[in-house]
């Protein structure tokens, strides 16, 4: 299966972080907007915004994001950033993407949570007008933030669903702030009406995956801690949960120490619902075409598998049922030409 074919396949992505996915030209433009001086060469700039192939840990990997934070402190910057990430996705035939971001990381200079979300939604709308893509936004609460901060963000976004905000996630330091410490916040999100996904099992603790299932959350990011957990995998499959897998990122952060310790094959063999995602296009120096190529190389993934994974993504997405029907039809049309 060639790179060209993999690029042409229609794709849906559920797990993509805004601040970790900005293109280098976009980073330069945003820095100019913020009067921030960057290294003159892309080779030097890449050292600041792309994590090493092997980092010490997830916490080490997350340090890369501090370089981007000052660039995303205005409505104009957030709007352009959202447009840029959706544009990148559209250029590799991603027909649906959910882009997630943490409002509080863009509130250093006076923006409110609703200001940040509205700006991102405007950028996604700009991209949708120009490209063949449906782009929606998720808000991330940060696990390490105070509950008061997160509750205030939830209050500010409660009425933004009609504008394209479709769901909520908790990201950040999962090891120090486990899922069972977020129960009151998760209940608050549920009362707001937003469906949820959670980063779960990225730090090696399978209990966080079980805790998510106990809370009725059926979409989870990473789930690398499923490896070797036969009973939990069985439960994950039986409860119709969906895995947002991020191979390159997990190898970088050592969430998976090797291909052999990545849970894909076990989950696939058990009939689990798998989706393939970039996590952070720039920080991990990847895109969906590259991720698909890795699955072909390491797992022998076939085109018919990619169709199923993308159908899983659309069905598990937080967009409307009518939008899902349209997207599923587009997927089938695209893949039919390769499966005949």
Curated annotation (Swiss-Prot):
Xref: InterPro entries: A_deaminase (IPR028893), A_deaminase_dom (IPR001365), Ado/ade_deaminase (IPR006330), Metal_Hydrolase (IPR032466)
SUPFAM superfamilies the UniProt entry points to: Metallo-dependent hydrolases
Cofactor note: Binds 1 zinc ion per subunit.
Amino acids binding substrate: 17, 19, 172
GO CC aspect terms: cytosol
Cofactors that this protein relies on: Zn(2+)
Keyword Hydrolase: yes
Any Gene Ontology biological process: hypoxanthine salvage
Binding positions (Zn(2+)): 15, 17, 199, 279
Substrates-to-products reaction catalysed: adenosine + H2O + H(+) = inosine + NH4(+); 2'-deoxyadenosine + H2O + H(+) = 2'-deoxyinosine + NH4(+)
Residues at the catalytic site: 202
Any single Pfam family the record assigns to this protein: A_deaminase
Site feature (Important for catalytic activity) residues: 222
EC number: 3.5.4.4
Keywords: Hydrolase, Metal-binding, Nucleotide metabolism, Zinc
GO molecular function term, any single one: 2'-deoxyadenosine deaminase activity
HAMAP family the UniProt entry points to: A_deaminase
Function statement: Catalyzes the hydrolytic deamination of adenosine and 2-deoxyadenosine.
Similarity comment: family membership: Belongs to the metallo-dependent hydrolases superfamily. Adenosine and AMP deaminases family. Adenosine deaminase subfamily.
Protein name: Adenosine deaminase
Species of the source: Streptococcus agalactiae serotype V (strain ATCC BAA-611 / 2603 V/R)
